[in-house]
Regions:
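ATP-dependent helicase/translocase motor core
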Residues: 1-157
Length: 157
């Protein structure tokens, strides 16, 4: 890493590498291609008005499923939970998403990463070793859909 990088640039470089290692295709705007892989992470994604820019918006199979907020190493990640939740609620109209708000939220310095799964009724952020693979998020979305379908089926009997 260049010595003149800012702490935030170093964090983003580490986060890009972690996302890539987990199977995500990391892209900037413009030139976004949601078909570049099962999981695509788009940097600096403009959210709906009054919701700012998500450092990374996560797409699985062409649908928005989560957001990642990047901070420099040493930054207290718990303090930015409201910020990433704002992104999860601020998906621009017209973008495909299986859930609104977006269910999968990450906070990361590139060294420390925290995660919340809003599909869990008792969700909270917790430390994780790495960003999850796109296949894992797909499995969680399918399981949640199956649970809703089974609950509806049981209620209709």
């Amino acid at each position: 890493m260049p010595a003149h990088d800012t702490p935030e640039q170093r964090a983003r470089r580490r986060i890009d590498a972690a996302l890539t290692a987990a199977g995500w295709v990391v892209q900037g705007r413009p030139g976004t291609n949601l078909s570049a892989g099962l999981g695509v992470a788009i940097r600096e994604f403009r959210m709906a008005p009054d919701h700012g820019f998500a450092d990374y918006l996560l797409f699985v199979d062409g649908q928005a499923v989560g957001a990642l907020e990047a901070k420099p190493e040493g930054y207290p990640l718990a303090s930015v939970e409201p910020q990433v939740k704002l992104y999860s609620e601020g998906l621009p109209n017209g973008l495909p998403a299986p859930h609104r708000p977006l269910p999968f939220l990450y906070l990361s310095t590139g060294v420390e990463t925290r995660f919340a799964n809003l599909l869990d009724p008792e969700h909270r952020t917790r430390p994780v070793f790495a960003v999850h693979r796109p296949e894992t998020l797909t499995d969680w979305l399918r399981a949640e859909t199956l649970e809703r379908w089974l609950a509806a089926l049981a209620g209709g009997s």
